[in-house]
UniProtKB/Swiss-Prot annotation:
MF annotations from Gene Ontology: ATP binding; tRNA dimethylallyltransferase activity
Pfam short name (any one): IPPT
The protein's name: tRNA dimethylallyltransferase
UniProt catalytic activity: adenosine(37) in tRNA + dimethylallyl diphosphate = N(6)-dimethylallyladenosine(37) in tRNA + diphosphate
EC number: 2.5.1.75
Originating species: Rhizobium rhizogenes (strain K84 / ATCC BAA-868) (Agrobacterium radiobacter)
Gene: miaA
Site for Interaction with substrate tRNA, residues: T107, R129
PANTHER family: TRNA DIMETHYLALLYLTRANSFERASE (PTHR11088:SF60)
Swiss-Prot/TrEMBL GO biological process terms: tRNA modification
Sequence positions that bind substrate: T18, A19, S20, G21, K22, S23
UniProt entry keywords in alphabetical sequence: ATP-binding, Magnesium, Nucleotide-binding, Transferase, tRNA processing
Source domain of life: Bacteria
Signal peptide start and end residues: none
Length: 298
């Protein structure tokens, strides 16, 4: 139980590393504040990977409404901007109903966008987006990066030559608008959540406890059907550059399906990758979340 609940709040924000117990805390606080849980994790939006992304089950939800989970097809382009628009519409609806949105997830950028706004990026025609993503798959990042250097050197200088998703995004913007993506990144859209009227919690467990949870969790995921999920995902034939293909466990389980890894190796490498990801999250939260965020160690 979290101590010292605040009064007169209109939103609750909960973040923390993977396997920290934040989803259960969200349900607890949603129940206490007549709230609704809203996903703020960039991988839990996809419909294909329920087990592998640790999306809350019906049992986990305990009868509390949960939104923005599993509603995006794996092959569909999805961005922080799209999530923010969906979150804004949901917050407006919940405020009309007098209910408290309880945002929970490990994607730090989502929380920064909620409370600080996001660059007002232009809409990209589907034809342009599809064509460039097909080119990324067919030609690779090096070729598209060389093209970006020629047409938008400012954007190219700020990106890794191997960051396929961001290279494509920059090319999309300049083709659709004739302007560099940098011109839009300086324009900030509306703030959805007033940080001063939100209860903000970052869950930071003891490292040893977190590692123990992660080790057991990955094994449980395999037992619950993660292998079948990855098999279904691979059957879609998506580009390896699509965000959903980069979910932790996908590459390891795919290797097992190809006969290149044993189950034991999948457990070891999957858990190791999850621990590394949790470490990066912990570092980011400690550096980015100021003193207004309540630190909790479960």
């Amino acid at each position: 139980m979290i101590r010292n609940p605040m009064s007169d709040i209109d939103a609750i924000l909960i973040t923390g590393p993977t396997a920290s117990g934040k989803s259960a805390l969200a349900v607890e606080l949603a129940r206490a504040h007549d709230g609704v849980v809203v996903n703020a994790d960039s991988m839990q939006v996809y419909d294909t990977l329920s087990v592998l992304t640790a999306r809350p089950s019906e049992t986990d939800m305990e009868g509390i409404p949960h939104h923005l989970y599993g509603h995006v097809p794996a092959g569909q382009a999805y961005s922080t901007g799209v999530w923010l628009r969906e979150a804004a519409a949901l917050v407006a609806q919940l405020r009309e109903e007098g209910r408290t949105p309880v945002f929970v997830g490990g994607t730090g950028l989502y929380f920064k966008a909620l409370t600080g706004g996001l660059s007002d990026m232009p809409d990209i025609p589907t034809e342009i987006r599809s064509r460039l993503r097909e080119r990324l798959l067919a030609e690779g990042t090096d070729e598209l990066y060389r093209e970006l250097v020629l047409c938008d050197p400012t954007a190219a200088e700020s990106l890794s030559s191997q960051d396929g998703q961001r290279i494509v995004r920059a090319l999309e913007v300049i083709e659709a608008t004739g302007q560099s993506i940098a011109a839009f990144q300086g324009k900030t859209g509306p703030v959805i959540i007033d940080a001063d009227r939100a209860r903000k919690i970052v869950v930071l467990p003891d490292r040893a406890v977190l590692h123990q949870r992660i080790n057991g969790r990955f094994e449980k995921m395999l037992a619950m059907g993660a292998e079948a999920e990855v098999k279904a995902l691979l059957a879609l034939g998506l580009s390896p550059e699509m965000p959903v293909m980069k979910a932790i466990g996908v590459s390891q389980i795919a290797a097992m399906l190809r006969g290149e890894m044993t189950r034991a190796e999948v457990l070891d490498t999957g858990a190791a990758a999850t621990r590394q990801y949790a470490k990066r999250q912990m570092t980011w939260f400690r550096n980015q979340m100021d003193e207004s965020w309540e630190r909790v160690s479960p």
